[in-house]
Amino acid sequence: MTVTLGKPTSAWLANELDGNHRPSRENVVVAASQELTDGTVVSLNANGQAQIYAGVTDEVAAGIFVGDAVTTGAGVTGAGVIVARTAKVVAENLTFKSGLTTAKQTAALADLAKLHITTVRSA
């Protein structure tokens, strides 16, 4: 008998809550002018829409984008999914905004830890 293993959900996602409808995840509206890929750390803008975490003053990381990439144009929103609570992630496999400092990445991980999204070492 041949068994074919499917693609893992994500290289950055070590564990999440089990159950119907994936309770760790939330559907989100992706803000305009975004390019989100699997494993991108996101925040929510003033309208509650997901955007790449940029580490600006008072910005709080709200989750990690999961699934197929979503690119939105100027003035156009999209649909996506984020891991928003209770999960274990491999920090070195997460995607941050290009040029984001290590200190701001650490701050984002601290925000995620408050949501019970914690880091583990890669195998």
For every predicted segment, state its role.
Residues M1-A123:
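Surface-exposed, low-hydrophobicity beta-strand/loop segments enriched in small/polar/acidic residues
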